[in-house]
Amino acid sequence: MMSKNYHIAVLPGDGIGPEVMTQALKVLDAVRNRFAMRITTSHYDVGGAAIDNHGQPLPPATVEGCEQADAVLFGSVGGPKWEHLPPDQQPERGALLPLRKHFKLFSNLRPAKLYQGLEAFCPLRADIAANGFDILCVRELTGGIYFGQPKGREGSGQYEKAFDTEVYHRFEIERIARIAFESARKRRHKVTSIDKANVLQSSILWREIVNEIATEYPDVELAHMYIDNATMQLIKDPSQFDVLLCSNLFGDILSDECAMITGSMGMLPSASLNEQGFGLYEPAGGSAPDIAGKNIANPIAQILSLALLLRYSLDADDAASAIERAINRALEEGIRTGDLARGAAAVSTDEMGDIIARYVAEGV
């Protein structure tokens, strides 16, 4: 299919990270063989595993390894073992946030899909769940109220106050809007931009610039929606949405709402990208230390993270689609890990990985 050589930095991390990563790498093997792709991998410690082995959550060797790669496949970090450490030395804040900053990962892509056969897990009304949904939440990661200056606290007594500042620059809005429109072209050609342009100056600028960028994509339909209405519409009829384009704060809220209405966090991948197309790909859920090592974790979010990596960093859409079809097939056949079994027979983490890898190899 392609002759280029690719290299992936693999960071399994903690908890269920290593065992679900093993399944993703089985699937990668199947992709390599079926599509004749030349992809190599190198493993590096991160999070708690790196603290145990190197005394810090993000060793220089790990950062260096990621710099030499085309993309990073990340597992999960954290657990009770390291909770006594100062916050910036704990696995989550000491590894993931510095990686995002170092590689200037400004866009976060969170797909949320209700798979056929899993409607019973959706907390929405049955008639709404029956319509299904397949949403991609595109969130700006480095601007907005989380990073704007000034921020702080001052004064005392009745006059004590705290303040944060929502700041967006034109270039930040333009580049995240382009990610959303490009993503929509690979999907159902619709972008819904979320703002609060009836109140906020930053949202007024956001809407103006998104309208400008939309003229570059005449094949993509654009709609605008206020954040308060969007949270309601996601509950009322999520099937109306394709790509949601959001600022940092609004995307933080909506991507979690999208995840929740699928009813299955173990199924949701996440991608964080920079302007060069370099990305860090990880499951949206946590390290689940309570089930680590028991061979019962759901590896699908990690495997779907690999699919996103293939699509967005390696431009291998065929391979990504093959993985997604294999997962659909497994779920349609009633194959479930324990989190989705509901009394039915459950397969192990290893078995689920084997089945999906086999289906990729067979070209289902």
UniProtKB/Swiss-Prot annotation:
Annotated pathway: Amino-acid biosynthesis; L-leucine biosynthesis; L-leucine from 3-methyl-2-oxobutanoate: step 3/4
Cofactors named for this entry: Mg(2+); Mn(2+)
Gene Ontology process terms (BP): L-leucine biosynthetic process
Span of the signal peptide: none
Record-listed Mg(2+) binding positions: 228, 252, 256
Keywords, in A-Z order: Amino-acid biosynthesis, Branched-chain amino acid biosynthesis, Cytoplasm, Leucine biosynthesis, Magnesium, Manganese, Metal-binding, NAD, Oxidoreductase
Annotated positions for site Important for catalysis: 146, 196
Note on cofactor: Binds 1 Mg(2+) or Mn(2+) ion per subunit.
Keyword Manganese attributed: yes
Domain of life: Bacteria
Subcellular location: Cytoplasm
A single cellular component GO annotation: cytosol
Principal subcellular localization: cytoplasm
Pfam families recorded: Iso_dh
Residues that hold substrate according to the record: 100, 110, 139, 228
Xref: SMART domains: Iso_dh
Family listed: Belongs to the isocitrate and isopropylmalate dehydrogenases family. LeuB type 1 subfamily.
Function: Catalyzes the oxidation of 3-carboxy-2-hydroxy-4-methylpentanoate (3-isopropylmalate) to 3-carboxy-4-methyl-2-oxopentanoate. The product decarboxylates to 4-methyl-2 oxopentanoate.
Assembly, per entry: Homodimer.
Record's protein name: 3-isopropylmalate dehydrogenase
Organism encoding this protein: Escherichia coli (strain UTI89 / UPEC)
